[in-house]
Amino acid sequence: MLKENQSKWSSAGALIAIGIVFGDIGTSPLYTMNSILNSAKSAHNLDTFVIGSVSLVFWTLMLITTIKYVIIALQADNHGEGGIFALYSRVKKPNKKWLLLPALIGGAALLADGTLTPAVTVTTAIEGLKGQGIGEFIFPNNQTIVLFVVTVILLIVFTFQKAGTKKIGKIFGPVMLTWFLFIGFFGLVNIFSDLSILKALSPTYAIAVLFSPENKTGIFILGSVFLATTGAEALYSDMGHVGKHNIYVSWIFVYTMLILNYMGQGAWIMSHANQENLLMQSSNPFFEILPSGWRIFGVVMAALAAIIASQALISGAYTLVSEAINLKVIPRLRTFYPSEARGQMYIGTVNWLLCIIGLIIVWAFQTSHNMEAAYGLSITITMLMTTLLLYQFIKQEMKNKILAFFFVVIFGMIETVFLIASLGKFLHGGYATLIIMVAILSVMMIWFYGNKRREAISQQNDYLSLKDYRKQLINLSKDNEEPIFASNLVYIVNIHQNYMLKRNIIYSILGSKPKRAETYWFVTIRSSNDPYEKSYSVDMLGTNNIVHVTLNIGFKVEPQVNMYMKQIANNLVKQNIIKPQFPKYTLNKRGTVGEFKYIMANQNYEDLLNLPDIHTWDRFIISGRLWLQSHTVKPSSFYGLEVSDVLEETVPLFIKDSNKSKIKLIQNEVKNVIKPE
């Protein structure tokens, strides 16, 4: 949905929100109650336990999802975008450098937990097929076959990502609407089997079950309850797709359907409390509440909902990584834009890492029961980090220190309790997502602080003023004794105040082989907080052939630098700001702009590692940063210059002073000299 239409809700927008935003939280009923049942001491006298457990789910969704995320967090958007990195971009200040740490930890944890979501949702859905018949065919009660089916589904989902979801995405809303109506209806039907489940609306039962003798895990039951709200962070992250007003309206419907289903599952469990196989892993209350004639339809709908939830998570991962690249905390990654649909992107590295890790998890954990035991630990960390950033938002943007204090205390305590409860998952597989989180966080820290240390060490003699070299560039441009290197010579640079730019750029132009051009272009690309911004400004530096262009590009916009430069050059020619160029050989006989040649002048930062006084920590982090750079996309590819005329250069980081090291002439004479006439 277009950003300009997000200021108000519409029925179409609400339908899109149901299809995109609520996939993760909407598939939680597949496994939440099943996981909670593992905390039951026995299959007898379950009423108090079940009512208390459903009450915990109800109030968890009310407090964390509804109040924290839907009511409060959705106010903290950054140009309409949500999520932990968008929130950080909104609140970051030069004097609040500590805010970066919770943003990095939260972002890494969110990406790590996302590796488990497709695996657990799709596996749970397909497990519902066990023993079910379609005509004369009976699906085998064989977990290995389930794993193969899950593998095929996940491979198909990840393989088709590069094609985009413009066409198929139109059915997400209707499918998820059908899903929520389906689970809500059968939940309501089962509530009538034991109306005492309605007691779950009282918070007293939620508190009581934590200390109930029927609860064999005590407070650690919250680790399973938390599964009901793991999609809340994804809900916030997907705000930019549909707008907060559509989320407000659609959440009322979604929340109602979810609670009806959880209560229906609870009522079914209580009405079957004396069945000895009730606590068996093969007995999932989500599927058990369905009449036998509806089971196959339920499995198909669950599989579709799981696929859509996975799709939403994958798209959210692309957005999250793009925001991280925009903040310069992750190396540049090759990004494709499968269609002209706004916000559609594809990052192959992210896609296949999610796929590979997800498949490893499927085959390592084998069953949805084992995956549930590991799921949710990392997301509690993300939620705690979001709470810290929201505290800063309320205090800084809403100017309400009292509300900020109560917010961070209340939700900090609630989420800390959930984190402690989820720590019980560590030995049951939670370590897997924590390892992934630490790996992602390490990449972020090395890249960000590697850049900081690299710049701090090298900047002492690393910058020159472009203004000081205007005359030389103008003279070089007019020097007919030098061959024309290019009509338009373009450098991607970062120009600071007073026209300061890196010395390697001037070295590249005026070095041993001067590069003569009709027009010199120095292009600074700014990453805009507005995800869809495409704008530019021009500074001619008092000349007609030295141009500083600043491109402001949002992180959801394809950086087609060559196309933008041709448009800008033609505009400047039309305005008579730069002289027209008439190429001798060209397809466009009316063209007034010649060819563009791009120079990527890369400094050899490995020179830093050879400095005798460099600190061991600096050496380590800069080495790590250089290693990451060597394994990621080149700037020319990132800026869409693959089919352009690009020259990659490497220039020395330090130019040695010839006066510091002198060589001595033997015998103080030169032999056999012929003096010039």
Swiss-Prot record:
Residues spanning the membrane: 13-33, 54-74, 98-118, 137-157, 171-191, 217-237, 249-269, 296-316, 345-365, 374-394, 402-422, 429-449
Membrane topology recorded in Swiss-Prot or TrEMBL: Multi-pass membrane protein
GO molecular function: potassium ion transmembrane transporter activity; symporter activity
Main localization, broad class: membrane
Top-level lineage group: Bacteria
PANTHER family, per the entry: K+ POTASSIUM TRANSPORTER, OSMOTIC STRESS POTASSIUM TRANSPORTER
HAMAP family: Kup
Protein family (similarity comment): Belongs to the HAK/KUP transporter (TC 2.A.72) family.
The protein's name: Probable potassium transport system protein Kup
Organism: Leuconostoc mesenteroides subsp. mesenteroides (strain ATCC 8293 / DSM 20343 / BCRC 11652 / CCM 1803 / JCM 6124 / NCDO 523 / NBRC 100496 / NCIMB 8023 / NCTC 12954 / NRRL B-1118 / 37Y)
